[in-house]
Structures are given as structure tokens and as C-alpha cells.
């Protein structure tokens, strides 16, 4: 059995994502960091960016956040975000709509053009792979 870590992403409007992941990559305020099961406990502030969720079948899901905090334990990652958009769906049109919502959310929260370009490239690349 694979070692999976539990992930929950919560905003003031409610739960955006809940599930298990093999790897979670978070946009920490000091840079991206990855979390696997058994990671040392920590609390980190998060900047606007993408949470990359690698599922047990090696597929990826993306959640765009504007900012927030992450609490990491050996078995669970809890993210409290000011705003978040899950970038996914069952059809190309749904994915495209959510991708635009995510881009709008991130644009509204960041003025760093290099960070924006990097975040948008990551989102576009993930959508092309699906």
C-alpha cells in the first residue's frame, strides 16, 4: 500500500478540497515546498499560487489560492486559505472556466509579474497534460 497523506483545503466559504495524496506541493511564503507522509510537523504561511496535489495514481490536481496558512503533521496537511479555486472538471469547457477563475483570483492578489507568469505556466502545463 502506498503512503498517502490526508489533505484538506478550507476557505471562509467552506471546504474546497478533501482527499488523500502521495505528494502535496505548497506555495510557501519563502518558496515552494513538498510534503510526503511522515513529514516533520510545521506551520507555514502561504503566498498566492498553486497547490499541486499528486494522487496515488500519479495524476495531478491543482488548487489556486490567494494566500493562507498550512499546518503539516506526519499524516495530514490542513490549508486555511483566504480564497481558493479548484482547477478541474469533467469537460474541457469546465476546466477552461475554472482555469480563468483561478487566474483572476491570483491576479487580484499579486503584483509580482514573475510569480504570476510562473503560476500561470504551471496551471496551463497541467491542463495541457490532461
UniProtKB/Swiss-Prot annotation:
Assembly information from the UniProt record: F-type ATPases have 2 components, CF(1) - the catalytic core - and CF(0) - the membrane proton channel. CF(1) has five subunits: alpha(3), beta(3), gamma(1), delta(1), epsilon(1). CF(0) has three main subunits: a, b and c.
NCBIfam families noted in UniProt: ATP_synt_epsi
Gene name tied to this protein: atpC
Gene3D superfamilies: F0F1 ATP synthase delta/epsilon subunit, N-terminal
Protein name, as recorded: ATP synthase epsilon chain
Top-rank lineage group of the source organism: Bacteria
Subcellular location: Cell inner membrane
Cellular compartments per GO CC: plasma membrane; proton-transporting ATP synthase complex
Entry membrane topology: Peripheral membrane protein
GO molecular function: ATP binding; proton-transporting ATP synthase activity, rotational mechanism
